[in-house]
């Protein structure tokens, strides 16, 4: 799916590098994406690529890891 958040759809934006002499060249601002395991409401666990804003806001439910006794 490329560099795009699977929850909010955030993707790269275009901007400029600006030098001291004010010469502008194109650059890309990439979102901070992380691959995390997400537990779906059905109980299934799936790996998704999400931005850190969605992680912090609680939009992704991490699966419960059980310790073996």
From Swiss-Prot:
It holds the Pfam family Ribosomal_L28. InterPro entries: Bacterial_rp_bL28 (IPR050096), Ribosomal_bL28 (IPR026569), Ribosomal_bL28/bL31-like_sf (IPR034704), Ribosomal_bL28_bact-type (IPR001383), Ribosomal_bL28_sf (IPR037147). The keyword Cell inner membrane does not apply. One of its GO terms (biological process) is translation. Keywords: Ribonucleoprotein, Ribosomal protein. One of its GO terms (cellular component) is ribonucleoprotein complex. Gene3D superfamilies: Ribosomal protein L28/L24 (2.30.170.40). It comes from the Bacteria. One of its GO terms (molecular function) is structural constituent of ribosome. Belongs to the bacterial ribosomal protein bL28 family. This is Large ribosomal subunit protein bL28.
